[in-house]
Amino acid sequence: FMRLRRLGVSAGHAWNGSWEAIAASSDDRPYEVKMREQLALIAGDQLLASAYGALLRNAVDDRLTIKDVTAKLSDADKTLVPDVEPTADALLERISALANGLERLQRDLPTDALTQLELRVASVQAEPEQAPDRERRLTLLTRQLSSLQELVSRREMMQRQLDSASMALRSLRLDIVKLRTMGVGAAISDVTNATQEARALSKDLGYVISAADEMRKL
């Protein structure tokens, strides 16, 4: 609470939930500091060093911009776009979860794993039927191929979802900046539409991620 007091947040604001906007508008720390802090909350060093690091940094940049712009809106304008902040938070959470899952799959599944396994299956299939242990090996390899194909399909689906969530967050950022630049009257429709679409996408992704988590527990 003392940290909030230093940012100009009173006890009343802390209790009624308006402290976040006040704290955001009072946060004059360098951008790089806020960027590092937010990244540390959603990703470890290994993930940030992976192929998804740049995407995560862009997502955090979008989120910080949205937070900065909405913090500077008047109270009256904020009431017109109440869902922007929670929607942006939900999208960033989904992006982080999907990037984490994809990074793990990338480590566990070599790029050429499917091709190599298909070649092994074809090689065993080409053996004479009387070849020693042919049927057992073919059954085992076919089962492995089916499992690997399922994992590759899941990876492709997660990549599409990650791209969609990233684009939704970027659209929300652009529309909220447009609102600040052109005024609420000119941009409110764009922001509302972007928020509704992003909220629906975030909800759908939440179901998918939760289902995947449950499957891993089985």
Task: Place the predicted regions along the sequence by residue.
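Long amphipathic all-alpha helical oligomerization modules
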Residues: 125-218
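Membrane-proximal, non-transmembrane interface segments of integral membrane proteins
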Residues: 2-128
